[in-house]
Amino acid sequence: MGNVIKSQVGAQALGKNVRVSVTKMQRIIDRIRNCSYEEALVLLEFMPYRACYPVSQLVLSAAANASNNLGLNKSDLFVSKAWVDNSKYLRRFRPRAQGRGYPIKKPTCKVTIQLSSKSIEK
């Protein structure tokens, strides 16, 4: 892999096995990326998607991590990085005729939200 030095400037929150498909979550994450903390919460509150609630909980958790662990002010925070990855599929079976069963794959995803301070970025 080489020598990769990762410097974590902000705080992050990770949501695992969120029961939403990646494409549905991606349209929400693309909307809040590079927004301020308050603006992201307002956008998530008024967007008409079911997947907004887990993302808003992650933004609140990342802000709490930033204020408690790093001592950053919540008014200076913004969403610096946000991404979605595939996770496991929940496998279920639908009963069909003559004793058969058809598999159903219910997708899940991993969501990562990273908040940074505006004063650190400048």
Swiss-Prot record:
It comes from the Eukaryota. GO terms for biological process: translation. SUPFAM superfamilies: Ribosomal protein L22. GO terms for cellular component: chloroplast; large ribosomal subunit. PANTHER family: CHLOROPLAST 50S RIBOSOMAL PROTEIN L22-RELATED, LARGE RIBOSOMAL SUBUNIT PROTEIN UL22M. Part of the 50S ribosomal subunit. This is Large ribosomal subunit protein uL22c. It comes from Adiantum capillus-veneris.
